[in-house]
Amino acid sequence: MLRIDYDLKTGPVIVIFCSGLKPEFYANTKDFSRVFLYDTESLWFQKEIDSIRRFLDSIPDKTMTLGVSRGGYAALLFGHLYGLRVLAFSPQTRLYDDRWPEIKEARKVSKHTEFFDLSFVEGRNTVYFCKDNPKDEEHASRIKAEIHLVDGKQHNSASVLKSQGKLGDVIHTFTHSE
């Protein structure tokens, strides 16, 4: 099931695909209108692709997508589909990763097998991942993106950046650049 929250102001809209992180994690986006999409079933947004597309079609002034892990997958997918700038932390780019047992269920419920592999994704993509995490490096290397390495081996590079006091600067720099 898809849950949507929003904080609308005037001006550009950031679409944030949430994979379990609370909205306050994205505090550095508060100067923008924000739409938060939550994949409450942890299925890489696969059950809701058509609903998300209809919803995004109705939002003017979309400028960027943002997400972490499976939210990063969705940020890349919908950023590509809508020609938006993307900031993704440790995203999956193929729905074939044995680290998450739910990924098999995501493939089973999806109506869009063409999105199981995002190697076709192009655009203005910025991806962060921990440099000592070979699986995340493999995912990131499959797409066209500006790559940033984070010290560490964890999967969640955004949490690592937050613990280092750097996440706010990363998000601010991304959201305030063209």
Language-model region placement:
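Active-site signature of alpha/beta-hydrolase-fold catalytic machinery across serine-
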Residues: 77-81
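Gly/Ala-rich beta-loop-alpha elbow adjacent to hydrolase catalytic centers
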Residues: 67-71, 75
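The feature captures the conserved acid-bearing segment of alpha/beta-hydrolase catalytic domains
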Residues: 102-178
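Active-site nucleophile loop of the alpha/beta-hydrolase fold
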Residues: 87-98
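Short, structured coil segments at secondary-structure junctions
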Residues: 30-31, 82, 143
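Active-site catalytic motif of lipid deacylating hydrolases and related acyltransferases
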Residues: 2-59
